[in-house]
Amino acid sequence: MPCEVPARRIFSEFCEHEGMALKFTISYREDSLDVFRYYKKLAEGAMVQVTDEQLFTPLDEEANSIAVIVKHMAGNMRSRWTGFLTSDGEKPDRNRDSEFVDPPGAREALMQLWDHGWHCVFSAIEPLSDADLTRTVTIRGEPHSVMQAINRQIAHYADHVGQIVLLAKHFQHANWKSLSIPRNKSADFNQKVRTREISQR
């Protein structure tokens, strides 16, 4: 006779599976938000160290200034995250090429643009349910799972934040205050993480 699995066991295993899936999706959403917040903070820690002039200064004619990178990121954020689940990520009113010229002329206006872009990011991701993470969205008509779309933007923003940090460090030279592990301080950092004095996340 074929083995029969008690209904109670089936139900228990189903609940365990569903619980694990829910924990995974919640963890993914929260981890993604933490990564986005980390890169936002990293860029802001770099930008606060440069002068207003340096904020708008490119290294050469083909390079982007920090201000241009910020304008591009903000434009991308508005396009990708507005109506994230219900509309294409490349909005018809977006003019991507214009994001690389004529940034706002003052730091305050630039940071308002920056903050609005990040508001779009967090407002789209924070309410996502576990069911939402299984959905499909499009970018330029190309299908992406919600997780793929989030991962894509994490990688994109990390790339540009790295550029911002590099430019700021270049301009500040010896006055630069490290935003990661200071040179020759790896052992100290490792010990502080192990003793829970600080977190590396």
Regions found by a protein language model. Give the residues of each.
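Basic polycationic patches enriched in arginine
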Residues: 8-9
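Short, charged, low-complexity loops and linkers
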Residues: 19-34, 101-102, 109
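Short, contiguous alpha-helical
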Residues: 29, 33-37, 44-47, 52-98, ...
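Hydrophobic alpha-helical core bundles mediating ligand binding, dimerization, or RNAP-core interactions
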Residues: 36, 40, 47, 114, ...
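Acidic/histidine-rich alpha-helical segments that form the ligand environment
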Residues: 101-137, 144-159, 163, 201
